Amino acid sequence: MTKKTILVTGATGQQGGAVIDALMDLDKSGEKFSILAVTRKADSPAALDLVKRYPRVKLVEGNLDNVPALFESAKIIAGEHQLPIWGVFSVQVSMGPGVTFDGEVKQGKALIDGAIANGVQHFVYSSVERGGDARSWESSTPIPHFQTKKIIEDYLNATCGKQPGSRMDWTILRPVAFMDNLKPGMPTSLFLTALKNHLGEDRKSLQWIAVHDIGVFAAKVFDDPEKWNHTAVGLAGDELTMEQLSRAFSKATGYPMPLTYSLAGSLLTFVARELGLMIGWFASEGYKADIEARRRDHPGMLTMEQWLLTKSQFSTGADGAQIGA
């Protein structure tokens, strides 16, 4: 068996970190994969913690604003082990300080071009679900950070070809709302209140995915690329109305779903325009990933209740009071 070298972007972030976790879990002996973890600063606490947990992982210092330099650094490190870069996991930051619409698109396209130029065999792009596997190819939605991902998807499809054996094989993973973005504290209370304002108690459901499971699917692609080649699939592990979400919180943690005043939730969607557009889209259309199909691929995919119990930062004290709020 030839070991595959996988370049993982966003290695110290949620998705990249989950991909590394899943690859390491799938390859405990170290015979299948050699992992190159891209980080802006190799001496950052997060990067140092990563290699402390996984000594086999090799850090590559670089960023997606200079993809040629990133690949040069990666090839030097991969060359030490006489292994070409076989696969790339691509994820870009889409919201936050300094992040722009054009910047995300530029990074995503540049990484595709760089991967092709450097002979990468399989490219996995983490995008976003936009209303079903087929509809996502057509729908950009009104949400800017969904639109960027469709542009990058289209570029990947057009540049690499639609048939296996073309310039570079690829798989697109389209996750829905991240369970992991729910954390103790006021931001989550505001977000959930805004959701409830738009979705009602039981009027409209919303799909959720644990970041852990995004990593599992990426690892499955790298392990069995022929099965997933030239496919684009939505990833969701649960679908809940707000009433069902509240019950999941109560069962898993012993206390109610964290909410605040309805007016505060309305103010959030008014002030944070893009967030308001996204929540409005959740109410009018929403995610439509095929949960049953994905659970056949990955029977251990987490439900919201399971995630709250095993992966979240939510917990209860002896008296049932919330810790960490």
Spans of features found by a protein language model:
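Eukaryotic N-terminal low-complexity, Ser/Thr- and Lys/Arg-rich leader segments
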Residues: 1-5, 25-32, 52-53, 80-81, ...
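Oxidoreductase cofactor-interface core, primarily capturing Rossmann-like NAD(P)-dependent enzymes
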Residues: 2-33, 38-48, 65-67, 96, ...
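NAD(P)H-binding glycine-rich loop region in Rossmannoid oxidoreductase-like domains
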Residues: 34-118
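Short, amphipathic alpha-helical "lid/cap" segments that border enzyme active or binding sites
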Residues: 71, 105, 109-112, 211-219, ...
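Short beta-strand segments at enzyme active-site cores
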Residues: 90, 122-127
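A hydrophobic C-terminal alpha-helical subdomain
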Residues: 228, 261-325
